[in-house]
Swiss-Prot record:
Component of the commander complex consisting of the CCC subcomplex and the retriever subcomplex. Component of the CCC (COMMD/CCDC22/CCDC93) subcomplex consisting of COMMD1, COMMD2, COMMD3, COMMD4, COMMD5, COMMD6, COMMD7, COMMD8, COMMD9, COMMD10, CCDC22 and CCDC93; within the complex forms a heterodimer with COMMD5. Interacts with RELA, RELB, NFKB1/p105, NFKB2/p100. Interacts with CCDC22, CCDC93, SCNN1B, CUL1, CUL2, CUL3, CUL4A, CUL4B, CUL7. Its main location: cytoplasm. It comes from Mus musculus. Residues 133-202 form the COMM domain. Scaffold protein in the commander complex that is essential for endosomal recycling of transmembrane cargos; the commander complex is composed of the CCC subcomplex and the retriever subcomplex. May modulate activity of cullin-RING E3 ubiquitin ligase (CRL) complexes. May down-regulate activation of NF-kappa-B. The gene is Commd10. The modification Phosphoserine is found at S155. Belongs to the COMM domain-containing protein 10 family. This is COMM domain-containing protein 10. The modification N-acetylalanine is found at A2. Disulfide bonds: none annotated.
């Protein structure tokens, strides 16, 4: 029950905007929408719906394109939080009602999560553990001279060399990633965020 209690959905401006839009969706169609999003939730690079399907959803739910995207993103966010906290269906329903989602919609979330939650969590585990493993990290600095004769500034680039292996192979594949100063700083900040989230879960 500790994991369930840890799930807290923030009442952010986008969440407050999305809740009435979700509440207005036809209750009969809502479970199918949830089911489709849950099926593809673990495929981060892939959208749950094609452009043509999104147009049909806009018409069916009487939503503008931007409103539909907000609804889909919010539903995905809620379900991702349920995955990361491995929350119980009843706790998910309770949290959704606390952010003013109508009871029928909160129940639909809980019902979909009860039916597909564990399967979705397992898909996420497989994606996270994945077939690739980081074996080595190397780095070097490259200095590139500016092409302009007037500007003799050097543009330093950091090159990370990542050695990754697959579980079923002995060879280590080398992946080179190049960063300028800003890109490296942004990457560092992302690592800090990831580290903070890991620390909060351990």
């Amino acid at each position: 029950m500790a994991a369930s209690a840890a799930l807290i959905l923030p009442e952010s401006p986008s969440m407050k905007k999305a809740v009435p839009l979700i509440n207005a969706i036809d209750t009969g169609r809502f479970p199918r929408l949830l089911s489709r999003i849950l099926q593809k939730l673990h495929l981060k690079a892939e959208s749950s719906f094609s452009e043509e399907e999104e147009e049909k959803l806009q018409a069916a739910f009487s939503l503008e394109k931007q409103e539909l995207h907000l609804v889909l993103e919010t539903i995905s966010f809620v379900l991702e939080q349920a995955v990361y906290h491995n929350v119980k269906p009843a706790a998910l329903q309770q949290q959704l009602e606390m952010i003013h989602l109508r009871k029928d919609k909160a129940e639909a979330f809980a019902s979909a999560w009860s039916a597909m939650g564990q399967e979705t969590v397992e898909k996420f585990r497989q994606r996270i553990l994945g077939p690739h493993k980081l074996e080595t990290v190397g780095w070097q600095l490259n200095l590139q001279m500016a092409h302009s004769a007037q500007a003799k500034l050097q543009s330093p680039q950091a090159v990370l060399q990542l050695g990754v292996s697959k579980e079923d192979a002995k060879n280590v594949e080398k992946v080179l990633v190049e960063f300028n100063h800003k890109e490296l700083f942004d990457f560092y900040n992302k690592l800090e965020t990831i580290q903070a989230q890991l620390d909060s879960l351990t």
